[in-house]
Amino acid sequence: MCPAFSIFFNSRRYSLTPPTYTPSPKPPTPKPTPPTYTPSPKPPASKPPTPKPTPPTYTPSPKPPTPKPTPPTYTPSPKPPATKPPTPKPTPPTYTPSPKPPTPKPTPPTYTPSPKPPATKPPTPKPTPPTYTPSPKPPTPKPTPPTYTPSPKPPTPKPTPPTYTPSPKPPTHPTPKPTPPTYTPSPKPPTPKPTPPTYTPSPKPPTPKPTPPTYTPSPKPPATKPPTPKPTPPTYTPTPKPPATKPPTYTPTPPVSHTPSPPPPYY
């Protein structure tokens, strides 16, 4: 094989690996040291403290109490009640078509709150819970623990160790430990819980429900309106979907190999 061709072949073969990029090391730029700021010493005592002027005491001039103007008593002009003829109002009751007797409708007005008088019965079962007060629960078991005081615990075994004292110490003065004061807490009187006031709701008088006015609609002439035929909904025929075409297969373009130009052959 010709040496020039072998060099060209080798350069083509080894050109597939990209050259490693080694950046030139930059010298570390030294950070400039900030100049130390030395403030000029101010003479502290040269400036006498200027006394603040006392603000003048503002004494507001007493305003005379402005008398509130009494609002004029509104006396409505008496309307003559006789000018309003109440005759046209009784005419709607006359507009009760007799041919349609609404006999089942008057029965609901008969359902008046008259059977509600049992509500006037005082709520006797409610006062019974207030009678269950915590007063019969005497806190007697609590005073019993205070009776368990340290007094029955005689500190006699503790004075015995002071008897085991060196001979220079006179055993005649064994410092007996002071008996701890028997802490007998003052028995708190059982604070009876305040009995909640028996809430006796004021019996509300059974408010009679106003009888609803018997609404007698005007008799509509039956069968005068021909039944409108409901339009038949249009049958929904879905449009046939075209057969799903396969997406075009993506053929990636081959990457352009950026191969450097071969070095000139060595002769």
From Swiss-Prot:
Top-rank taxon: Eukaryota
Chief localisation class: secreted
Record flagged with keyword Secreted: yes
Annotated region (Disordered), positions in chain: 1-267
Biased composition regions of type Pro residues, renumbered to the chain: 20-267
Subcellular location, record wording: Secreted, Primary cell wall
Glycoprotein is among the record's keywords: yes
Keywords: Cell wall, Cell wall biogenesis/degradation, Glycoprotein, Hydroxylation, Repeat, Secreted, Signal
Tissue specificity field: Mainly in the coleoptile node and root tip.
Function in brief: Structural component in primary cell wall.
Name assigned to this protein: Extensin
Gene: HRGP
